[in-house]
């Protein structure tokens, strides 16, 4: 959201949009309809939103599991991977009450073991999809935003101020 504010662009979160369209939380979708249904809803949201101009689109970590979503995200503009260690991701999840209440377990293990397991699958896809990688370890949010802005193509920054 802060990046969008700096660019003077709109901001949307795919998880929020899935919940809005479904009228249920992600946890409820997983519990009643399963992960495949959630991933299809997520895919539909990305397909709809990736065509919008001047939009910072925040996705859940699993959005890149779908090849069509990866293609659409890359075609839409720069894709930023906010990289962090397993421990940092775990700490951030525990510090965010909204994430704790909305996020279902993705494996039988949960916790740090789950994060490690999921990252082993997703990291190659993040690398494939990302045009910009920012290591967020030890950085404040304002520093992360500054690093992303440094890496964005100049033409995008010029467009944001016109």
Placement of each model-derived feature along the sequence:
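ATP-dependent small-molecule kinase phosphotransfer cores
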Residues: 12-74, 95, 99, 106
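Short amphipathic alpha-helical segments
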Residues: 1, 68-71, 91-95, 146-147
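Short glycine-rich anion-binding loops that position phosphate/pyrophosphate groups of nucleotides
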Residues: 61-63, 85-87, 139
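Structural signal for short hydrophobic segments within the conserved structured cores
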Residues: 10-12, 104, 132-134
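Glycine-rich phosphate-binding loop of ATP-dependent small-molecule kinases
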Residues: 1-28, 52, 78, 153-162
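A glycine- and Lys/Arg-enriched "phosphate-lid" helix/loop adjacent to the NTP-binding pocket
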Residues: 75-123
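NTP-dependent small-molecule kinase module
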Residues: 6, 78, 91, 120-162
């Amino acid at each position: 959201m802060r990046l969008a504010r700096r660019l003077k662009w709109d901001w949307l979160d795919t998880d929020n949009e899935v919940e809005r369209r479904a009228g249920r939380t992600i946890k409820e979708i997983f519990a009643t309809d399963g992960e495949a249904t959630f991933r299809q809803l997520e895919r539909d949201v990305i397909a709809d939103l990736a065509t919008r101009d001047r939009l910072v689109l925040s996705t859940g970590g699993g959005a890149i599991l779908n090849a069509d979503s990866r293609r659409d995200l890359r075609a839409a503009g720069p894709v930023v991977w906010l990289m962090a260690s397993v421990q940092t991701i775990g700490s951030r999840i525990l510090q965010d009450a909204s994430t704790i209440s909305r996020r279902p377990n993705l494996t039988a293990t949960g916790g740090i073991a789950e994060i490690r397991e999921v990252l082993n699958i997703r990291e190659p896809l993040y690398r494939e999809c990302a045009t910009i990688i920012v290591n967020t370890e030890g950085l404040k949010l304002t520093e992360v935003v500054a690093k992303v802005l440094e890496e964005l193509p100049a033409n995008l920054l010029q467009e944001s101020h016109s």
